[in-house]
Amino acid sequence: MSKILKQLKIVGLVLLLALTLQSNSAIVYAGEKSNVGGDFTLTDHNGKKFELQQLRGKLVLIFFGYTFCPDICPTELSSLAKVLRSLGDDAEKVSALFISVDPERDTPDKLKNYVPFFSPNLIGLTGSESEISAVADAYRVQTKIHSKKKDSEYYLVDHSANLYVLGADGKMLNIIPFGLPTEHILQVVKNEINHLNKL
């Protein structure tokens, strides 16, 4: 009997270790993250010029996607919206950006009808193909268009689905991979807000 209990304890410790490693690896603290990101100028969902530097002093959350995305984008934007709602008064210290990787279809008008569905505090951004490509490269976002036929508006875009967290100085703090539970994202954001409050 004691042998069985000992084996169960070992199995339990192994599972606990696995879960710990998994939770610690969920947030990317890559040594190269200081080389990811940077300022940019795009067009917001109201058709106005938008510069990242105008958000200095705030924590900035950035997600890249597109309005025709069938699954990942709605899921992540819903999670992001829940995070913003859960922050209460601290939400005013955070700005959330949705940058389109499909500028051909995602016009400002298209974004204007899309982003408020998730949150009134979400800013939709688009631009020319060269502008979007430059920002995607700076943030190391991978994109690939699939099944696009000539003159067709129906196609899919594969893209990286990380959530980028920028500090009040515009520098990269965290790169959160797709699939992290909303509660974990919220905790990361709260931790960064607490750090911001101490500055």
Regions found by a protein language model. Give the residues of each.
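Thiol-based oxidoreductase modules, predominantly thioredoxin-like and allied folds used
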Residues: K93-D106, N121-S130
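N-terminal "domain-start" segment that seeds a small globular fold
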Residues: A26-R56, S78
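Bacterial N-terminal signal peptides that target proteins for export
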Residues: S2-G12
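Short, internal strand/loop/helix patches
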Residues: K112-S160
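Thiol-/selenol-based redox modules, centered on thioredoxin-like
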Residues: K149-L199
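Bacterial N-terminal signal peptides
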Residues: V11-Q22
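Short active-site neighborhood of thiol/selenol oxidoreductases, capturing the structured segment around
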Residues: Q53-P74, L80
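Conserved helix-turn-beta segment immediately C-terminal to the redox Cys motif
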Residues: K58-L59, T75-I99
